[in-house]
Swiss-Prot record:
Belongs to the UPF0398 family. It comes from the Bacteria. SUPFAM superfamilies: MCP/YpsA-like (SSF102405). Signal peptide: none annotated. This is UPF0398 protein MCCL_1095.
Amino acid sequence: MKSIYITGYKPYELNIFNNKQPEVRYIKLFLQQKLKEYIEDGLEWVIIEGQLGVELWAAEVVIRLKKMYDVKLSIITPFLEHHSKWNEENQLYYNQICARADFITSAHNDIYRGGFQFRNTDQFVLDNTEGTILFYDDEHEASPKFFKQTLIDFASENQYNIDVVTLEDLSDFVNEYMRAKEY
């Protein structure tokens, strides 16, 4: 697999209100381990749509991994200026990530016009990647549930890899990580 899309929860959906919260560190460590496995199997491109939360945390991980691996980061936003209504801190954070991305574009060369832009971008990304890592748990419903159904429908008609990460997967990882640190 050469290209993968990563998406999932927004920070507030996980009760995360600051990137310095310890949960963010564990999510990034988990994503780093997962991405290393994909990179060692031939992954070249990681694609995100530039949303706060799992997507930008994954972007941070990719930027770190670029120092050791030949992997690239692409940001394909649904529309122009998608981050313009974010607070100043989040805009700065986003711009710092964009400065290190290998490719940035918008699926729609226009400002926000409607929800169709998100659906069209999701479809474009699915059509142009070979798999998705979806950080989502049916036990903890939130915004990714809509994409999950689109993803399942797409994969049922196409040869496409789905890697769903649940909160239990993350919890298991954290427990193993903590045990390993004890030794």
